[in-house]
Amino acid sequence: LKFSGAYLSSAHLPKIAQPLLHSLSSQTGMCHSVVILDNHEVITVACSYLASAEKNRVLPYGIHNGNRIAAHTASNGKIILAYMQDQELDTWLEHYPLTRSTKYTVTCGQTFKQQLHDIRDQGWCLAVEEHEVSFIGFSVPIFDGSGRVVAGLNTVARSEQYTVEQVMNRCLVPMQELAKQLRMLL
């Protein structure tokens, strides 16, 4: 397992987030995670368990601490990338090509940058089948006390079980509230 400077500099985040994530899961009935950006990937540093999954400590959709996925393919990566300064994002795009995970993955740099601009304007990110077919990802940013995005808070749902509207209605406000709590604690 790789340990990054990004993780080491935010090592207190998992301890702070963990009990809040469990409370959020109790409220929404869904699993949630906190991720940080590590080069071209996001890494899960804290995740919640539903009561039904608690016994086996197995989470749906491959969500577990240490899990890594390409940042540009998932809502939790896009929410972090959306808050990068333009020059920083351009450098990131030069180093990390937008490879395709599914037929819905955005691979055009200009389209991707516009999508990130829209995400930043709305303050949340929805990714439907971009990382994996049949999955909806939904994320909000986690800011530190100085106003810098340090992580993403997300949930993932199977599109056979939930519509986009159901995910949004169930999760948007509670996730935004939890992100505000974390900001005050960071």
Where are these regions (language model features)?
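Residues at helix C-cap/C′ positions in short coil/turn segments immediately following an alpha-helix
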Residues: 28, 38, 120, 149-151
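Juxtadomain coupling helices with adjacent low-complexity linkers
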Residues: 122, 133-134, 151-186
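Amphipathic alpha-helical effector-binding/dimerization core
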Residues: 5-94
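Short, basic/aromatic recognition patches
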Residues: 16-24, 93-139, 177, 185
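Short amphipathic alpha-helical interaction patches enriched in hydrophobic/aromatic residues
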Residues: 4-8, 100, 161, 186
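Sensor-regulatory modules in signal-transduction proteins
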Residues: 142-145
